[in-house]
Amino acid sequence: MAVQEAMRRELNQRLKLDPAKTAVLAIDTHRGHLDPEIATMPVAADIAAEVVQASARLIEHTRAAGIPTAYLVMHNRVVNGRSEYLRNPFWAAVEDVRASLTPDLPSTISGHNLVASPQTEVMPELAPGPGDVVITAKHRLSSFLDTDLDSWLRALGTETLLLIGINTNTCVQCAAFEAMNRDYAAVVVSDCVNSMYGEDLHDFSLENVARCFGWVLTVDEVIGKLTPVAGGVAV
């Protein structure tokens, strides 16, 4: 463990963030997960509030540095009276046994993030700004599959992705895998992600990313790397 921690510190020191070549991916930072009043697949309310607060702080700094954000928002259409979510065999099976994907909280697969529902709205505290893009063609765990995300990133000359959002162990980790496969530097911002599935899978996923294919940094660490330096000292 000491060897792994030493390696992680060295890797974190080597990571440089060039605002001109960096983008934020805000993955499913919508009301369907993060607004306890209407969420259809809710993160626990206290955790949701922490993720929103940390993410708002991150975006304030990245936006000031000229870094754009892509908002990936899950959308599901109703086809023949049934959510297209239920074309997936596993999700259909969970729906059939009326099981909840969220420990200790009710959730609905068939009613999750239907097109034009309020659940598909980005949390107001994280609202898109000029130069940002909202991608609504996300229908599964992947932020890249059948979307124009990669095209947008390539057009910007992006090399590094700051990943935030829900869920750490599904959509966020999937984005980190796919970013790595496309030769982006994947950085998961640890206090800007969490999971409706529970802390065990959240923690496992952060460890998996950090040890295998990307960086895991806190908001403070990211801000520190974006802060201009004078004489080698952050100002």
Predicted regions and their residues:
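A short alpha/beta connector and helix-capping loop motif
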Residues: A20, I38-T62, G66-V73
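Acidic-leg catalytic submotif of subtilisin-like serine proteases
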Residues: A23-H33
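Surface-exposed, active-site-proximal loop segments in enzymatic domains
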Residues: P36-V43, E84-L86, A179
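Short, well-ordered beta-to-alpha junction loops that form the rim of enzyme active sites
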Residues: L72-H75, R82, K138, I166
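Catalytic P-loop NTPase motifs of RecA-like helicase/translocase cores
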Residues: H33-L34, M196
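Surface-exposed cleft-lining segments at the edges of enzyme active sites
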Residues: H33, T40-I47, I109, L161-L162
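Active-site-adjacent betaalpha module
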Residues: M1-A23, E60, A64-A65, N88-V235
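Short beta-strand segments at enzyme active-site cores
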Residues: I27, I67-N76, N80, V189
